[in-house]
Amino acid sequence: MSSHGDASVLPKIALESINDYSYVKSVFRQAIQEKLAIHLPEQASREAGMGREDQLRIRVKEMLNELIESTFSIIQENVTINGFDANSALQDPKNSDQIEPFDLALRTRVQQLFNEVEDAHVLVARYRKSVPAQYEKAYVDAMEQQTAFLRNVKDDYVSLQDKEVENPDEQTSTTVFRKEDIDRYEQTIAKVAYLKKNLPRVVARLEKTP
């Protein structure tokens, strides 16, 4: 694989603003000027030019400026400014202001919300398994209570009939139920009616939950 091919897959240098780009360029320019001052001092140049900067130093400065501009023109293809290509951002600075800088706190909050959604999905999946079984058990228990109550009522009725046969003069009533038995019967019937009405709706709601 060629080196050019390797370079094509490298990530671009990401800068947040045009000011960052200008700062990097100014640092690069300053470093070159420092090298120029070492190798072609301005004072020596003016002494050679009789008080004026000699032509050699002037030409070297021009070439170095061309080098700086050429270098940063080339690297613009590998630089982004606030998510935009450097060329586009530098030509129209408004482009680089359309996207907000990365917000770590906002990303953390989004991750927390995502985790809460995941937890909710797990909870719903758990309810899909447990809630129908709980309703079914409550329904079965209510039916068993009702059946046991009716069986007791039947036994009491038979017992009262036997007493009437054995003691016809004793006042007994096979048509009057004890108040607590009636209340218990009504409560059981209410439970069964509630479960019968709400169980299909609860199951359907859980099945529709994503």
Curated annotation (Swiss-Prot):
The keyword Nucleus applies. One of its GO terms (biological process) is mitotic sister chromatid segregation. It holds the Pfam family Mis14. GO terms for cellular component: condensed chromosome, centromeric region; cytosol; inner kinetochore; kinetochore; MIS12/MIND type complex; nucleus. It is found in: Nucleus; Chromosome, Centromere; Chromosome, Centromere, Kinetochore. The keyword Cell division applies. Its main location: nucleus. Keywords: Cell cycle, Cell division, Centromere, Chromosome, Kinetochore, Meiosis, Mitosis, Nucleus. InterPro entries: Mis14/Nsl1. Component of the NMS super complex which consists of mis12, mis13, mis14, ndc80, nnf1, nuf2, sos7, spc7, spc24 and spc25. Interacts with mis12. Acts as a component of the NMS (Ndc80-MIND-Spc7) super complex which has a role in kinetochore function during late meiotic prophase and throughout the mitotic cell cycle. Required for correct chromosome segregation where it has a role in the formation and/or maintenance of specialized chromatin at the centromere. This is Kinetochore protein mis14. It comes from Schizosaccharomyces pombe (strain 972 / ATCC 24843) (Fission yeast).
